[in-house]
Amino acid sequence: RVPMGIGKVGGYASNGSGDIFIAFSTANEGVFSRKGNRTIEMVPNDQMSGLFLATVQAVEEAIVNVLVAAETMEGVNGNTVYALPHDRLKQLLVKYNRMKK
């Protein structure tokens, strides 16, 4: 669901974008054992939508937080990257229904 959150703020996984996603499993202990039968507990698939939505929203918010936290800085060979003007970012988020007025 991470790519969906990226897509909500305009990302489209362009060639060379370098997107990397890491996921952690909460699988039942011993579930991957190759010996004997195992009993597992799981949430029914139809009840996972809330978790999926929360993941998309968390990724979207994390990206916006990074945009707001960015500061103007100078790098190698005098290359300067500029912080985004917060008022303009807010305007864009409102315009594209990503934020309420």
Predicted features, each with a name:
Residues 1-101:
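A structural signal for small-residue-enriched, beta-sheet-centric alpha/beta enzyme cores
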